[in-house]
Design a protein with these regions (language model features):
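Two-component/phosphorelay signaling modules centered on CheY-like receiver
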Residues: 14-32
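Acidic, metal-coordinating helix/loop segments flanking the phosphotransfer/catalytic sites
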Residues: 33-53
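Acidic catalytic/metal-coordinating carboxylates
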Residues: 36-39, 64-68
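Receiver (REC) domain active-site loop signature in two-component systems and cognate sites
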Residues: 60
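Alpha4 helix (beta4-alpha4-beta5 surface) of REC/receiver domains from two-component response regulators
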Residues: 67, 87-104, 115
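C-terminal output helix
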Residues: 108-118
């Protein structure tokens, strides 16, 4: 039996976090979630490089998504990161600066995010 892909989703918007967690759990992913960058970083450190992909908001309290992505890319360089954001005039520039693999602007369709994940991860 194949092991499901393991995702970490980080967003300070509770509704978005809940919707993403529910959607990807139904899609048979193993989903962990965090309400801010600091909590996300703690989960990453606890799980020790076992995430297949991280989805993070860019604008959050404690540790911004931009800073978090930079940390992830230094500590876990093989882990793809998708940045999601609804703020700023140039979200692509922020995500590129932080070295996100993909960026998605809010609002977005869940199917669009699912497609990006499938593009970044091998089939299970």
């Amino acid at each position: 039996m194949n092991t499901p892909h393991k995702l970490l989703i980080i967003d300070d918007n509770k509704e978005i976090l809940s919707a993403l967690k529910d959607f990807f759990t139904r899609k048979s992913y193993e989903v962990f979630s965090a309400a801010d960058g600091l909590e996300g970083l703690k989960i990453l450190e606890t799980e020790r490089q076992s995430f297949d992909l991280v989805i993070t908001d860019l604008v959050m309290p404690n540790i911004s998504g931009v800073a978090l992505i930079s940390i992830i890319k230094k500590r876990f360089p093989d882990t793809p990161v998708i940045a999601i954001t609804g703020w700023g005039e140039h979200p692509e520039a922020l995500a590129t600066e932080a070295q996100a693999d993909k960026v998605l602007e809010k609002p977005f369709e869940l199917s669009e995010l699912d497609r990006l994940i499938k593009d970044l991860l091998p089939p299970v």
